[in-house]
Curated annotation (Swiss-Prot):
Chief localization: secreted
Localisation per UniProt entry: Secreted
Primary role: Snake venom serine protease that may act in the hemostasis system of the prey.
Name of this protein: Snake venom serine protease KN14
Length: 260
């Protein structure tokens, strides 16, 4: 009887995992074409490879994750379908890139942030509009929107033609500490996801925004080995903690340092 019960429990766990994986911009749907005017697609100029996403914060600047960096970057604005671009799509290249100290000085829990100055400003249009920086930090329990052209599967790289969106929850930092024991006691990151699994950012979604209660609060940074897995939420660079750094660089003070 005990053996039968153990086998039954194992079967339930397997079915539960299979369900979460299949639901796995894992677990989302195609974004509304009008809800991501600020979303930027990043490419490596030399290889043409897709590198992730960024957020347009004013006509000349894009905020993304440091680990999305390549030597020369192409940025596409007003993009929804990659195969059938919007008529108002605009393309720019990186003129300057700014990091916390260097493009290699970041970790899973600190300083995974990059500010890109464009070679020339973009113009607002039907599908292009900057997203404002936050005026206050987010609250645990907030409903947050994730989006990107990242893989739809955690077992193989399946990049969609259009960005996918999903709603997740802003969690306590302790939830990420429980999942990832290597995390320090404090971090300038946000912990977000669905603890029951099923919705998550994944490979290719890096650098994209975490929008909590309508406000830009985080930058997709990293997560568990499997996307959308139970009790393995994602980590997002906390935008609010880097406001002084961002605003100082945009104002021309490039000697400013990131918060410790």
């Amino acid at each position: 009887m005990v053996l039968i019960r153990v086998l039954a429990n194992l079967l339930i766990l397997q079915l539960s995992y299979a369900q979460k994986s299949s639901e796995l911009v894992i677990g989302g749907d195609e974004c509304n074409i009008n809800e991501h005017r600020f979303l930027v697609a990043l490419y490596d100029v030399s290889s043409g490879d897709f590198r992730g996403s960024g957020t347009l914060i004013n006509p000349e600047w894009v905020l993304t994750a440091a680990h999305c960096e390549t030597e020369e970057m192409k940025l596409q604005f007003g993009l929804h379908s990659k195969r059938v671009p919007n008529k108002d799509k605009q393309t720019r290249v990186s003129k300057e890139k700014f990091f916390c100290e260097s493009n290699e000085n970041y970790t899973k829990w600190n300083k995974d942030i990059m500010l890109i100055k464009l070679n020339r400003p973009v113009k607002n249009s039907a599908h292009i509009e900057p997203l404002s920086l936050p005026s206050s930090p987010p609250s645990v329990g907030s409903v947050c929107r994730i989006m990107g052209w990242g893989t739809l599967s955690d077992t193989e790289m399946i990049l969609p033609d259009v960005p996918h969106c999903a709603n997740i929850n802003l969690l306590n930092y302790s939830d990420c500490q429980a999942a990832y024991p290597e995390l320090p006691a404090k971090s300038r990151t946000l912990c977000a996801g669905i603890l029951e699994g099923g919705k998550d950012t994944c490979s290719g979604d890096s650098g994209g925004p975490l929008i909590c209660n309508g406000t830009f609060q985080g930058i997709a940074s990293w997560g568990g080995t499997l996307c959308g897995y139970v009790r393995e939420p994602g980590s997002y660079t906390k935008v609010f903690d880097h406001l002084d750094w961002i605003q100082s660089i945009i104002a021309g003070n490039t000697n400013v340092t990131c918060p410790l």
